[in-house]
């Protein structure tokens, strides 16, 4: 029987989890290193499990058997089907797993599940929209260096290029 509902937000910088009981009452929160699938499926599982363990430990609770847990995860890189499949094959025993992109779960969180749009600019960048008719569209999110306009890496490269051009006298300061 599923006793715990675990929500995972997994990206290129870190992993955050929330654990609730079956009624949806928040019990604990935890965090760990990155769980973007592009940084390795094994590493993603390692950090997700570490964040879950940290959450349970933060409230003085022992870690239950994974078969008592259902996990819903918004993960960066989930659209890469071979990585997604490998992630699912490596399931350590969760009773259920639901996977979505971290962009879509961020959109759902930002708008309470209602139609809307959002742009995330952090380690990576992506835009996502959910229309009133249920259709969704993602823009960007292809990863560094070709599809990450607005990300930290993209902005940093542009800033360094401008600074060097300014030092050469080819750009204004």
Regions found by a protein language model. Name each.
Residues 135-173:
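Glycine-rich phosphate-binding loop plus the immediately following alpha-helix
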Residues 13, 76-78, 123-126:
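Short glycine-rich anion-binding loops that position phosphate/pyrophosphate groups of nucleotides
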Residues 1, 95-119, 135:
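Conserved phosphate-binding catalytic cores of ATP/NTP-utilizing and phosphoryl-transfer enzymes
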Residues 5-9, 68-72, 116-120, 127:
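Short glycine-aspartate micro-motif
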Residues 2-46, 50, 54, 136, ...:
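Short glycine-rich, Thr/Ser-proximal phosphate-binding strand/loop in the N-terminal lobe
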Residues 36, 56-99, 111:
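Short beta-strand-loop/turn "lid" adjacent to the catalytic site in phosphate-handling enzymes
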Residues 15-19, 108, 118, 125-130:
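Short beta-strand scaffold segments in enzyme catalytic cores
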Residues 46, 50, 105, 153-161:
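Residues on a specific face of well-ordered alpha-helices
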């Amino acid at each position: 029987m599923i006793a715990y509902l675990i929500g995972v937000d997994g990206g290129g910088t870190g992993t955050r989890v929330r654990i609730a009981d079956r009624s949806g009452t928040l019990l604990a929160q935890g965090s760990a290193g990155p769980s973007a699938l592009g940084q390795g499926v094994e590493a993603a599982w390692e950090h997700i499990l570490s964040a879950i363990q940290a959450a349970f430990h933060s409230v003085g609770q022992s870690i239950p058997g994974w078969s008592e847990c259902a996990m819903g995860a918004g993960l960066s890189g989930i659209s890469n089907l071979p990585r997604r499949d490998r992630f699912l094959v490596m399931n350590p025993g969760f009773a259920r797993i639901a996977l979505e992109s971290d962009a879509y779960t961020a959109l759902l969180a930002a708008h309470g599940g209602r139609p809307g749009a959002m742009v995330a600019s952090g380690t990576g960048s992506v835009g996502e929209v959910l229309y009133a008719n249920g259709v969704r569209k993602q823009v960007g999110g292809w990863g560094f260096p070709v599809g990450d306009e607005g990300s930290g890496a993209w902005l940093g490269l542009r800033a360094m290029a401008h600074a060097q051009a300014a030092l050469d006298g080819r750009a204004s300061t």
